[in-house]
Every structure is written in C-alpha cells, then in structure tokens.
Amino acid sequence: MRAVHLLALGAGLAAASPALANESVLKGVANPAEQVLQTVDYANTRYSKLDQINASNVKNLQVAWTFSTGVLRGHEGSPLVVGNIMYVHTPFPNIVYALDLDQGAKIVWKYEPKQDPSVIPVMCCDTVNRGLAYADGAILLHQADTTLVSLDAKSGKVNWSVKNGDPSKGETNTATVLPVKDKVIVGISGGEFGVQCHVTAYDLKSGKKVWRGYSIGPDDQLIVDPEKTTSLGKPIGKDSSLKTWEGDQWKTGGGCTWGWFSYDPKLDLMYYGSGNPSTWNPKQRPGDNKWSMTIWARNPDTGMAKWVYQMTPHDEWDFDGINEMILTDQKFDGKDRPLLTHFDRNGFGYTLDRATGEVLVAEKFDPVVNWATKVDLDKGSKTYGRPLVVSKYSTEQNGEDVNSKGICPAALGTKDQQPAAFSPKTGLFYVPTNHVCMDYEPFRVTYTPGQPYVGATLSMYPAPGSHGGMGNFIAWDNLQGKIKWSNPEQFSAWGGALATAGDVVFYGTLEGFLKAVDSKTGKELYKFKTPSGIIGNVMTYEHKGKQHVAVLSGVGGWAGIGLAAGLTDPNAGLGAVGGYAALSSYTNLGGQLTVFSLPNN
C-alpha cells in the first residue's frame, strides 16, 4: 500500500509546530468529533477519521433530525460543529444559527445581517455562501456584500466587522475564509464585472487589514519578488503580469479569488487559485493575462508569493482556476514528495510539488475534454507547462461573433467549486464532476463600472456520445493521473464529497440525493432523497458517542440558477438555464439541513 500522510489532521502536528498555525484550529481539526473549517482540515482533504458509520452498516442510515434555514436559493458549504454547538449558515442574507445539540438543536442565537438587496443582481451564479470558519472562540463569516464579520461563538455578538470590497463596482463574496495563525484570509468575487481581484489578510482579533495581494497588476500590488518568486522553476522577472496585458486592461482584468484556501504549516505556505480574466471575449485582451488562472503559493504573514503556475494562459473559455488545492505527502517516483492536487475547471487534474511548484502530473479527469490535447510537461519545450490548444475549439482563433461548437468541458468546467475529498486509506481522490459541453460565441463589450463585463453567449448540453447524463462521480489516482472508477450521474455532481475512515464516501446530487459509496469500488451503498437539490458539502460529526452525517439541501448555484432565480431563457445564467432545464422535473427550491445517524439498536 502506498505511503500516504495527511497534513494538519493529527494532534502531533500541533505539538510539532505550535507557532506555525492557529492553535484553536489545530485542536478542532485534530478532533474528528468536530468540524471547525469548511475544508475539514488545513490540507483540504475533506477526510474524517470517524468510522462508526462504515461500508457494512451505512445502508441502515436514518434521518435523525432536520432544520429549516428559512431561506431559499442555493445552499453551499456545510455546518460547523464545535463542542455541543452546531453553526449553520444560509445564502443571502447570510443568516447564522447556533444550535445546541444537547437540547434538540435549540436555537441558542441567531445573527441576521442587514445587507442591501441590490447586491443580489451583482452576484455571479446565485446568492450562495460557502460557509463559516471557527478560530479563537469566534465564528467568521464573509457576507455577500463583502463585509467580513467576527462573531462571538457563545453569544453571537459582533466582535468586529470590516468591508473587504465595494458591491457598486461589482465586488461581492460567495466564499468561506481561512484562519491562519493570527490572521484570517479572504478572497473576492467580481470577474464578470471587471474587478481587479485580490486576496487579503486581516488581523483575527481586530479586523485590521494586514496585507493585500492582487492577482493581476504591478509587482508591488501582486506582492512578488521578480527574482525570488518562481514559475515552473524560473524567476518570474519584472512586470511579469503587466507585460501580458495590453495597456491598462489589467485594471479591469479579473483573476478573482472566490474559491478555497489550504495551508501547509511546515512550509508555512497558503495555496489558492485565481479565476478567469475579464472579459470572456479573448480577442479584447491579447496576451497570457497573467496571473489569472493561476495556482498561488503565498506566505500568510507577508503575502509574498513563493511560486505561481498559470494553468490556462489567455483563457478563452471561462475555465476559472479557483478550485481547491488538496495537500498530501506521498511517494512519487520512489521519493517522498509534498504534493498538491488540483482538479481544474479546464478538465485537467494536476499534481504539483507544493514546495517548488513543479508540475508532476497533468491529465484529463474526464475523457471528453477536447479543447486541448495535453499539457506539455517536456522541460526542454518552448511550450513547457502550457496546454496545447486545439484550433477547432479556440474561441480566439475562430473570432468574435462566431459560435465555436462542441467545446468540452463547458464554462462551468469538468469540476466547479464543489470540493473533492481524499482518503489516506485508499490513496484516492473522490471527485464530483460535470460531464457537460458547450457552444461559445464571444462578442465585443465595453467596460462600465458596476455593470456586467462578460462578452460571450453560451449554450450547454450533456457530453455527446456518452451515457447521456451531465455528471460523474469518480475516484482518481493523482500519481498516475488516471480514473480508477466512475459512477455516472443524470446531472452534474454539484455537492462536495466527504471521505471517511469507515471506507465510505458521501456526496450529494442536484436532484437532491445524499449518496454513500464504497471508497474502494464505487459501489452505491445508500441514497436518500432530501427536499431540494444538494449543492452543499457533506460533513460528519460525533455527538454523545454517536456519529452523524449532515448535508444542506437547497438547489441553486450556477447549474441550478434557473430554478433558484426563476429564469426561463435558455441562454440566461450564462447558458446554464437551458442546459439544466430538466432539473425542474426532479426538485424544487428549498433550504433544509438533514442530519443522519444509525438506529440506536
């Protein structure tokens, strides 16, 4: 069996590295009865050591209790559990509930921010929020209007709040946050509004801004060292971003940071991805558009970037690079390596050395991916590290006002933000995917602050010549770059996965099923239809010696935007309304937490 180790899961790491991470987070991460981060641990593995529910008995799961959030539209993320309190969040208006598990989920406190509803039409792809984080006795929430709030975990009282962006300029938030040491790290949304996007660190106790690093712009705004920050093993050089944009286009260049963050306490580096360049019309922005579509490794104290890797230079398809970075220590080619595995929207599964940024593996995790033949990993090649684009599917080469047809994947990617999971018992990654292709027609657009800056019309449909569905749930070998097994889904698998020590992997489906599969074989062991489509992430916790599994249901997100927002034009929702029109025959709006456990006997 391959030697595989997890980061930030055990108490031993906390003891070994007391100065390199937040002690309260490490304590919570080391206790599988709780969940203090949306990602389960700093390494983003979404793996639980709980094994009371296992492959033999998961078929006996029953609904233990439910809770209505009182809010409709897309429910992403998951609850947190700290001690006997469960913390539940909602999409806009981002209500937070504290539920006492010792008292039948009694509401202990409720926080309901007063946000201007004008932020709703500025949010891309539904009014979702990917959840809370816990650190140092505080619940951290990044609201839709970009207000970052620290709440007292016991009372719900506001400790402090700070505004991270300006919705009138198109800046909003849908993401969770990452507490690291004495800081909290947050991103920003707005790539469809021409926002120059960034990552920001705030002081955990006061909310004071410590540093801000942009994805695009001059070196001082990027927080890079032209001689020490590297890409593919070489210094990036002076003005590495500016040289790849025409004139001042970088000022409206996007590269937003609305995905997930991970952190390696040993290397003292945080990892995340930057999103698409603005506009979606590639003809309007010549050049590689650095550093959009990029994996970043930064020091959390200073923001200084150690290395960057751009996955999709001069993006022509909206293949946002924001998906999670999963950190593992594994043997690669016989040597122990600190690895980073990333399943990108562009359809390639990447394995990198997270210390150096070296790309070790880049393979398609859906065989229908056709926009590029491969990623060139020949270090002697002029195109080293770049995808080799197929001309037929190049919206740049085909030109403005030309409909490029049959591009796979669609803009929402082979996987969007819905997070994968990793099991150290199998050494496999469990990935909820989209099996969707598109037609893409770019057109010229003018930038106006606070107005959509998209410049493309899309239509989406199931991948042709396949099983007819729009998704798969797969197991992936990140060392070989191969699919080990694949389960077809009727719609995109839009719920985040959870792997457990009980040899069970959980995930949710757009039509509302919670599913449990065998981690080794993929065999379906259990499913239950919840009241609405699942785009949330499955979580597990232990209360009074009993393991529970919980998931939020509430259809929405990009794939479910037609239902969530009541849209009927097939081209609306950037093409998703037509692509997922059949979803309305299987589910409807909702907002519910469903909690499962085994029978008492």
UniProtKB/Swiss-Prot annotation:
Swiss-Prot/TrEMBL cofactor(s): La(3+); Nd(3+); pyrroloquinoline quinone
Organism domain of life: Bacteria
SUPFAM superfamilies listed in its UniProt record: Quinoprotein alcohol dehydrogenase-like
PROSITE patterns (alphabetical): BACTERIAL_PQQ_2
UniProt KW Disulfide bond keyword: yes
Induction notes from the record: Highly up-regulated in the presence of La(3+).
CDD domains recorded: PQQ_MDH (cd10278)
Cofactor binding, per record: Exhibits enzymatic activity only in the presence of lanthanide ions. Is inactive when binding Ca(2+) ions in the absence of La(3+). Binds one lanthanide ion per subunit.
Organism: Methylorubrum extorquens (strain ATCC 14718 / DSM 1338 / JCM 2805 / NCIMB 9133 / AM1) (Methylobacterium extorquens)
Matches recorded under Pfam families: PQQ
Active-site positions on this chain: D318
Record-given protein name: Lanthanide-dependent methanol dehydrogenase
Annotated GO CC locations: membrane; outer membrane-bounded periplasmic space
Parts of the chain that traverse the membrane: none
Alphabetized InterPro entries for the sequence: PQQ_b-propeller_rpt, PQQ_MeOH/EtOH_DH, PQQ_rpt_dom, Quinoprotein_ADH-like_sf, Quinoprotein_DH_CS
Record localization: Periplasm
Assigned protein family: Belongs to the bacterial PQQ dehydrogenase family.
A Gene Ontology biological process term: methanol metabolic process
